[in-house]
């Protein structure tokens, strides 16, 4: 018999034993899958409140608590035993004696398995070695676990299993649980900051008749009643700009976005973004907002603006470095795209510097490829790269001094993009021309180029005030602030291949 077959047979034996115990509970009139249970404390509340009291003080005060959670360890024999109960906040030891809980409840304790959910009422005390514990006066089985937890010492070694069975990961891996609690706090802090600065949170459609707001392949679905194709949104942008037209001057939305693209440590087809728009602002205002927002979140959630990511120490305290994309390319490669160059010259530069390009690319595309291939991953400390070429920025306002470029920036930290923002294009005639240029790109083979959105152009024709806009990938921000190497580590249920 192979080791795998042996393990499978052993698991089947354990499953049967647990089901037998479940049936025995039912035979004894006990529901193995209980209903409501009222507790007075979480484990860490007990520890925080009473850890500093001496053994004698605890005996004198006779403090009673009721706690509930999952049994993670168990030891002892005869008429007494110890176990560790785990809840949301951590673990606490319980001590169960037959003469304290009675014969029936002690039998339930003795037959309980690791992973079972239990409720305990008892007195807080300290053991002889000083561990704060709860001496049970009542022991109740709340839910019988019919499957054993992963082995205590080996845990979930298979990373893919951690992602597929996140519920097990959360049970046995405190760091994973901490990551997702921190994620929630990050989003809460983000909301509070924006609410306090006068932004209005809104909700806009997830299914669009025309995909827009980003260069990406959409997921396509079909509305049966209307008999029309619909697209899962690839960005939140265009509906929020319509709201700016309508007079909602400072808006934001936190929501899911869907892009039918590859999966990597940085990409998941379904991810969370925040997009915000502010009337009468420009990209420089949004730069200031971005660095202050991120620094505020770090300070509020982590208590510091200096964080560790991998081997790098990152300083999030404003102000952050600002550099034009053309200057960044010139510093790194010596190629000066401030000079007027032809497509042929740009292609020669790319060949000389081993920058991979496609035949359909213009000078602006090639400048961007220089940046992405030669510079992006070197930007470790927070850096705003601004002045993107107009060809890759169809929704951004042209720079008035050099219309080859736009008033746009991207934020890079630890070599990856974390935010994208610009002074929004509010000229409907220019916007139509940009969409038409994008259509030509699609015809030339760029299937991520924008489609024409007549409704959006019509909205601009009613007049959109000068506006600054921002998009931040929340998953990547959480990765940064929790020192997570993969986006899957910060998504509760990342997209996986079918087994």
From Swiss-Prot:
Pfam families: tRNA-synt_2, tRNA_anti-codon. It is found in: Cytoplasm. The keyword Aminoacyl-tRNA synthetase applies. Mg(2+) 2 binds at residue 417. It catalyses: tRNA(Lys) + L-lysine + ATP = L-lysyl-tRNA(Lys) + AMP + diphosphate. Its main location: cytoplasm. It comes from Bacillus subtilis (strain 168). This is Lysine--tRNA ligase. GO terms for biological process: lysyl-tRNA aminoacylation. Mg(2+) 1 binds at residues 410, 417. Homodimer. InterPro entries: Aa-tRNA-synt_II (IPR004364), aa-tRNA-synth_II (IPR006195), aa-tRNA-synth_II/BPL/LPL (IPR045864), Lys-tRNA-ligase_II (IPR002313), Lys-tRNA-ligase_II_bac/euk (IPR034762), Lys-tRNA-ligase_II_N (IPR044136), Lys-tRNA-synth_II_C (IPR018149), NA-bd_OB-fold (IPR012340). GO terms for molecular function: ATP binding; catalytic activity, acting on a protein; lysine-tRNA ligase activity; magnesium ion binding; transferase activity; tRNA binding. Its cofactor is Mg(2+). The gene is lysS. Belongs to the class-II aminoacyl-tRNA synthetase family. One of its GO terms (cellular component) is cytoplasm. Its EC number is 6.1.1.6. Keywords: Aminoacyl-tRNA synthetase, ATP-binding, Cytoplasm, Ligase, Magnesium, Metal-binding, Nucleotide-binding, Protein biosynthesis. The keyword Cytoplasm applies. Binds 3 Mg(2+) ions per subunit. PROSITE patterns: AA_TRNA_LIGASE_II.
């Amino acid at each position: 018999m192979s080791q795998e077959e042996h393990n499978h047979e052993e698991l089947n034996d354990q499953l049967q034993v647990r089901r037998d115990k479940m049936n025995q509970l039912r035979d004894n009139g006990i529901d193995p899958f209980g209903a409501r249970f009222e507790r007075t404390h979480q484990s860490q509340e007990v520890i925080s409140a009473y850890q500093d009291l001496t053994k004698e003080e605890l005996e004198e005060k006779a403090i009673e608590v009721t706690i509930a959670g999952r049994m993670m360890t168990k030891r002892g024999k005869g008429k007494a035993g110890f176990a560790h109960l785990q809840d949301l906040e951590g673990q606490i030891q319980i001590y169960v004696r037959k003469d304290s809980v009675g014969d029936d409840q002690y039998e339930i304790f003795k037959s309980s398995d690791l992973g079972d959910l239990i409720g305990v009422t008892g007195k807080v005390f300290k053991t002889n070695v000083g561990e704060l514990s709860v001496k049970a006066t009542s022991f109740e089985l709340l839910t019988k676990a019919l499957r054993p937890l992963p082995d205590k010492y080996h845990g979930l070694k298979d990373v893919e299993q951690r992602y597929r069975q996140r519920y097990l990961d959360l049970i046995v891996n405190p760091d994973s649980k901490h990551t997702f609690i921190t994620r929630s706090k990050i989003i809460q802090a983000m909301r509070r900051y924006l609410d306090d600065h006068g932004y209005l949170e809104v909700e806009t459609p997830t299914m669009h008749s025309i995909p827009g707001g980003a260069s990406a392949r959409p997921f396509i679905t079909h509305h049966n009643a209307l008999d029309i194709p619909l697209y899962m949104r690839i960005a939140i942008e265009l509906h929020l700009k319509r709201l700016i037209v309508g007079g909602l001057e400072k808006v934001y939305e936190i929501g899911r976005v869907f892009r039918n693209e590859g999966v990597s440590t940085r990409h998941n087809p379904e991810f969370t973004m925040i997009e915000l728009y502010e009337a009468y602002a420009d990209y420089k205002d949004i730069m200031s907002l971005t660095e202050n927002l991120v620094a505020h979140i770090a300070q509020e959630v982590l208590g510091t603006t200096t964080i560790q990511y991998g081997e790098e120490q990152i300083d999030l305290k404003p102000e952050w470095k600002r550099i034009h994309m053309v200057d960044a390319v010139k510093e790194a490669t010596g190629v000066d795209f401030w000079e007027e160059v032809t497509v042929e010259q740009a292609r020669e530069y790319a060949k000389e510097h081993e920058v991979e390009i496609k035949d359909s690319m213009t000078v602006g595309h090639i400048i961007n490829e220089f940046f992405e291939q030669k510079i992006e991953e070197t930007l470790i400390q927070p850096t705003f790269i601004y002045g993107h070429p107009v060809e890759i920025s169809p929704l951004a306002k042209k720079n008035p001094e050099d219309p080859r470029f736009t008033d746009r920036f991207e934020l890079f930290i630890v070599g990856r993009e974390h935010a994208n923002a610009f002074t929004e294009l509010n000229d409907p005639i220019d916007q139509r021309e940009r969409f038409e240029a994008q259509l030509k790109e699609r015809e030339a083979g760029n299937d991520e180029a924008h489609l024409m959105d007549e409704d959006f152009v019509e909205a601009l024709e009613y007049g959109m005030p000068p506006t600054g806009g921002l998009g931040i990938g929340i998953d990547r921000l959480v990765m940064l602030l929790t020192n997570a190497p993969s986006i899957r580590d910060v998504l509760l249920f990342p997209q996986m291949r079918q087994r």
